[in-house]
């Protein structure tokens, strides 16, 4: 049977890392962790699980960090996880079955269910949040995007959906959400600015309103209770902020 590695890029994940690794430690052949400068006891936790621990603080974005981490993988397959994710038993079986079958020219999408502010979000356009996370190590890799990086693979590749959820404990509080979304907004604006793009505040307003309507009404976010409403409002806010950030940068040129 082909071998499989878990690969992760992390920073200051002592709170979540053990819970994540507990769901994979008994059935993967290798755990690869690339740290970008943790100041908590992330490293000690990783090493206690037998992980191969590497460090790179020269941060050039999520995509390039994942590319570097993949270079350390020695197994036939790589499974990408974030520290705030957990592999369910059903998903574990689906992953092992895919690796055993070892189909050519295939990458695998995993359905992710996110818990936000204490509730699983099953609507709002968030579920099933299919993400490509499993593939042959020498077949594909992430692009070099600063943020919201995606796996790139050859034309003609079959994308197969696996069963079993990947649990994602994404936002633990509103403060946690705002801190993470601010980082994403900055990276988005950096990326757009580097391509010579500009934005207007009206674009920010219209995209924010569109975001709320889509999530809460069209994607039935109201079925996710108060958390669904809060998530739609915060997502609209984050959408506005990223356009406002890009707009504000252009003002300094005048």
Swiss-Prot record:
MF term (GO), any: glycosyltransferase activity
Keywords: Glycosyltransferase, Transferase
Transferase found in the keyword field: yes
EC number: 2.4.-.-
One Pfam entry name: Glycos_transf_2
Disulfide bonds: none
GTP-binding found in the keyword field: no
Entry's family note: Belongs to the glycosyltransferase 2 family. WaaE/KdtX subfamily.
Protein name listed in UniProt: Uncharacterized glycosyltransferase HI_0653
Source organism: Haemophilus influenzae (strain ATCC 51907 / DSM 11121 / KW20 / Rd)
